[in-house]
Swiss-Prot record:
It comes from the Bacteria. It comes from Shewanella baltica (strain OS155 / ATCC BAA-1091). Gene3D superfamilies: Winged helix-like DNA-binding domain superfamily/Winged helix DNA-binding domain (1.10.10.10). Signal peptide: none annotated. The lineage of its organism: Bacteria, Pseudomonadati, Pseudomonadota, Gammaproteobacteria, Alteromonadales. It holds the Pfam family DUF134. InterPro entries: RNA_pol_sigma_r3/r4-like, UPF0251, WH-like_DNA-bd_sf. Belongs to the UPF0251 family. This is UPF0251 protein Sbal_3699.
Length: 98
């Protein structure tokens, strides 16, 4: 039986819902969804430059889980940029679901 999922504390949302290459309609692109907790990890780790221990404590998760979320977020962002895909960002509604 899997462990129960911990409720994560999220404090931010993206200022927009989609990043995509210029000049290509969104309907023609493959979309990658950045989850709310991955977005939060990216902001705390890379924008605010918190240590993994500090950021994990703010989110109410383990350092290992924070590292996993950060690695996933970085991979999704890098994939979207290098392969010309659309990156869907979490909305306030998505934040409430995490």
């Amino acid at each position: 039986m899997p462990r129960p999922k911990k409720c994560r504390q999220l404090s931010s949302c993206a200022p927009c819902s989609l990043f995509k290459p210029n000049g290509i309609p969104a309907v023609e692109l493959t979309h990658i969804q950045l989850e709310a907790d991955e977005f939060e990890a990216l902001e705390l780790g890379d924008v605010k430059r918190l240590s993994q221990i500090e950021a994990a404590a703010l989110m109410g998760i383990s350092r290992q889980t924070f590292g996993y979320l950060l690695a996933n977020a970085r991979k999704k962002v890098a994939t979207a940029i290098t392969q010309g895909q659309a990156l869907r960002l979490p909305t306030p509604k998505d934040k409430d679901l995490s």
